[in-house]
Amino acid sequence: MNKKKKIFILGVTGQDGSFMAKLMLEKKHIVYGLVRKSSTGNLSNIKELIHKKNFFIQHGDLLDFASLERIIRKIKPDEIYNFADQDHVRWSFDIPFYSFNVTANAVIKILEIIKNYSPESKFFQPYSSNMFGNSINKKQDELEKFSPLSIYALGKTTAYYACQMYKEVYGLKIYGAIFYNHESEIRPEEYVTRKITKSVARIFYGK
């Protein structure tokens, strides 16, 4: 019989976080989801999960390091998924310090908390294809040279190297993946690719 794991998902109200929460609940695990107090009215992506017995909302903020430490120390999660992000490249030029804090400094703080209080936890950190900048190659992997051209991409690149360092120096169980644009029916229409896919769907259905 598979062990029932404790899963902590940062950014649980977003596209990726909510899908991960649903998957983990289907696997009969216990899911804790980080939700900002300011986001209490934006729970549409997890409304069907809120009353499930193995789903627990944890109030905190990616930049409120005390709340992250409190939650991780209390839960001692088996797995941590960091889907919380400021993922608008354009916005990162307008709010550079905030963007870098969210995409880079917060990740380092999470790694420090894991190292000090929950070293057996597995940690998953998503990266971004924006780290490659204007790469001329049609396909990229970790061997491709990083060339960040935005604060958002710079933060993701910093997070990548921080995760590599904590994995090699401290032996933490850190995993990652480089994300490219990916769509679903719940992705906000403020994203260009979502606008495109929704327009295609309207054309297909003759609307």
Walk through the language-model features, giving the residues of each.
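N-terminal Rossmann-like NAD(P)+-binding domain of SDR-like oxidoreductases, especially those catalyzing
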Residues: 1-184, 205
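A glycine/serine/threonine-rich, flexible loop-to-helix segment
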Residues: 138, 189-197
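Alpha-helical substrate-binding/gating segment
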Residues: 168, 194-207
